[in-house]
Amino acid sequence: MRKTLSAIALLGALFLSTAARLSAQDRTSQLYILGGELSNSAATSTADIDEVMPRMKAIRLNTVLVPAYWDLTEPTEGRFDFSLIDRTIFQARQHHLKVVFLWFGAWKNSMSCYAPLWFKENTKKYPRAMTRTGKPLEIASAFSEEVFQADCRAFTRFMQHLAEKDKGIGTVSMIQIENEIGMLEDARDHSPLAEKAYRGKVPAELLKAMGKQAAGQTWAEAFGTDEHADEIFMAWHYARYVERLARVARTVYDMPLYVNAAMNSRGRKPGEYPSAGPLAHLATVWKCGAPTVDMLSPDIYDTGFKSWAAQYALPGNRLFIPESRCCEDSGVRALYVMGEYQAAGFSPFAIDQAQPTETRALSRAYHLLSQMQPYLSKSSPRRKTYNSWGILFDQNDRQRIIADGDLLLICRHNFTLPWDKRATDGTPWPEGGAAIVKIAPREYLIAGSGVVVEFKTKTEHLQAQPHPLGEDGFTLGGKPAATESAVGSHKAHSFTGRRSGIGYVDQVSILADGTLQYLRRDNGDQDHQGRHARIGARDWRILHVKLYEY
């Protein structure tokens, strides 16, 4: 088997060096994942797989993220069982779904809990990472060649099996390598093998990538000796480990590859969160160390969704969110990332365990996004012509102004308008969000929920005075409670320039080729007599807005 791996490595080097090789951008451009990730144990039997896959189709997913378990794939060393993989692929095809397999190999959420028992028991051959005090961890050491070879043999057989079953069909659309790699209890591994590597020289390519001038330095000389320096050291070696697996995958069955990261949130220091994984502040290290991996992807569970997403929308790193807290706001968050970043996809975690109120919102959002695919997918010719944006609001983040040439799109949460009693009665605001696409001059699609959008020229906006509105839609006297832009004030000023007006607002559906199908017209009270386009909270619509100037 070792000779086989060596042959694969040689072929991989030749394959990866060819100039015809696809870039990460090209390879991931076909992805438009309206996904959901199964809970960790939801695919451990064929009965579970048979039960869960029909439910995923009913939620309007187009892709299911499914674990591939090393311990169940190779329960006895050298003997492989792919029955769970085969059943997943079969059920996906039956329900017209794509699959992203998650390789739960040497590490899952930092730990080596999905390694087979024969691997776990033989700590002499497959050593553990250690803290600085010498405490062994339930984490296989990334510095052990034996650990890598065992993981790689199983991963290689897994990829070979996928190629045999799926090449030319394409049910499997992407592979996640390991799961939330990272060190815990210490910022780096202090095992004997790790200490030997730490005393060595920093690779020249990493020093160059990080803007370090001096070559031939040790890790301590180049980066210092604190926990942040330890994290850089560990990140490099995790990345190099993953790169070797990625090269095997690329050679055996070429498809998009990514690694996911648990966020370093809540003020924790390295060692207190899963350190050295593909985190945003380590993106340079990971991109240098694992160039064959197409995407570094965030698992977002904490507050500040927009901020976390922005950190991973980097040049050469298409945004994909493989895990996010499944909640009633998941739907508008999906609309936001697909509109703002033309993301590769969005996938709430434990979708099989979600409550109906949570999956209902996600299903409605995915129904809109599936229709918007001709306008949002990076592989669509329309992406070469039209711009798109995403908006996402809550009770504290209520407005965004988008500049599109001389036109401003003044976007706000729907509850900034006062006539819905939920806006002012103390009810917590649901998040509102949308994907907005410009399909022609002065012509837009808005797909979302809980948003209101005004359209004004820049000169008009500069001369506008905010007028607080009452629940009847007219100017409110006294202290402002909510506002909508208006031209004019109590003082007389001469207006200059042109104004933007709404020609019409239509509710539409969209066919697979991008053709708009008229459903109904929103006018009068539904667009505030031509002042804005809006979609109510917990309503889900696609609006086609045509503007004019006067």
Residue positions per predicted region:
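Aromatic- and carboxylate-lined catalytic core of secreted/periplasmic carbohydrate-active enzymes
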Residues: L335-H461, G470-G473, G477
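C-terminal beta-sandwich/jelly-roll accessory domains of carbohydrate-active enzymes
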Residues: D420-W429, Y444-Y550
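Catalytic-core region of carbohydrate-active enzymes that cleave or remodel glycosidic bonds
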Residues: L97, R244-D254, H281-S380
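Polysaccharide-binding and catalytic clefts of secreted carbohydrate-active enzymes
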Residues: K125-T284
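Bacterial N-terminal signal peptides
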Residues: A7-S17
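Aromatic-lined substrate-binding rim segments of carbohydrate-active enzymes
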Residues: D48-K124, Y238-V252
